[in-house]
Amino acid sequence: FISIVVLLAFSFSLQAAEKGIARAKGESSSDSGSRIALVIGNASYASAPLRNPINDVRSIASALKKVGFQVTKVENASLQSMDDAVRRFGQKARKSDVALVYYSGHGLQLKGSNYLQPIGADIRREQDIRFKAYNSDQILAELEDGSQRVNIVILDACRNNPLSRSFRSASKGLAQPRYQPPVGTIIAFSTAPGTVAYDGKGENSPYTSELYNAILEPGLKIEDVFK
């Protein structure tokens, strides 16, 4: 039903990450160290708008707050807004125990690199993608400098994007990251590389709906959240 690809960086310690998302029953947020999250949802595209991303980020933000995260939520972000939000989050992440970034919206891959599509991006040529879309490697680069034990990057961005069909070198879905992630990093996609998902018929995308329930399940280990 839901296909997920998870990349664990070398030397990643599951023992340190088992409580990275869900708390055991009776555990307060102060018991689990500093947890911060940045959630971004882009839906209001001029071409091929999406139904679910705004609901997705609001649902995930709500779930994360319930398990002790301090959440920054950004909706319908321009390229500049996405860049500013990730940079500010990267600075905060240096002092955190767990840093989580979640994105819902259009994305595509170009020559093996993954790009998240901002709102208002005027992408007319293949070359525009590099300059007018947000390279997801920048998220990993921001998290690389932190001392946090666990980094989690979740991309629900594999929706069927018409731009992927418009350019010769652009491919559907997202690619396995080429950027070497920081130690202690989990990267999760809503589908396998090179495949696409669709907006769900309900309030949330199918992937986010399952993720929401997994986050709120008490005592669930992090490796089980992404199964």
Range-by-range predicted roles:
Residues 1-3, 20:
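Generic short N-terminal amphipathic or hydrophobic helices
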Residues 3-4, 14:
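Cleavable N-terminal signal peptides
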Residues 6-8:
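N-terminal leader/targeting signatures
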Residues 10-115, 120-123, 128, 190, ...:
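Boundary/activation segment at the start of structured domains
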Residues 29, 143-144, 177-179:
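Short secondary-structure boundary/capping segments
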Residues 34, 79-104, 108-165, 205-207, ...:
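Caspase-like (clan CD) cysteine peptidase catalytic core
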Residues 41, 53, 74, 148-227:
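Active-site-proximal C-terminal subdomain of hydrolase catalytic domains
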